[in-house]
Amino acid sequence: MDSSGDISSLNLLPKHHWKDKLEKHWRIGEKFAMEKYIHFRDNGLTGYKEGRNFPAQENVSVLSPHLHFGEISPHQIWFDDKGVCPEKDVAHFHSELGWREFSYYLIYHFPFMCTENLNKRFDKFPWSTNHDFLLAWQKGNTGYPIVDAGMRQLWQTGYMHNRVRMIVASFLVKNLLIDWRVGMEWFNAVSYTHLTLPTNA
């Protein structure tokens, strides 16, 4: 073994520095989480109820990784944004925070949701094992623009818009007939937010 002290000689790290591209999009810590929240509150919360449905608009908080890692709490957000924007937008944003908490509650009490079908009729479903289809989905090469855009965004940034997540998940299961657990494994591997909990609910 090389005793020069050069850790690179141990070949412990991947040759492709995947984390570098994530650092262009994310900074960690409470300070940055609060800055991102305030930017959303002042620029994206108004119009949230309708705007959140359109991936190209800025009516999304992109706070999921910061909430996941405890850099900002739902309580801080809940009590800070009241009265700063139209009530319908604040209320809808609060409902999304509530849905997130409900998702964690479900997984805490029913951990089997991460590995088993809720509807047992699907236990014998003949899922496809087509590796080419799976790879095309993972890399964003399906030929369906909205699916490919979402999967490429996930790969490049570790994040995907909520509405697009629903589309790509539905495409994997209903169109490609690939087991949802395979898709969940991919999301957990490349998502900055580790989506197991919110996605399952």
Question: Predicted regions span which residues?
Answer:
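Conserved small/polar residues in nucleotide/adenosyl-binding loops
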Residues: 193-199
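Alpha-helical scaffolds flanking conserved acidic
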Residues: 91-94, 163-167, 186
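Beta-rich nucleic-acid/ligand-interaction surfaces
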Residues: 181-192
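C-terminal catalytic subdomain
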Residues: 175-181
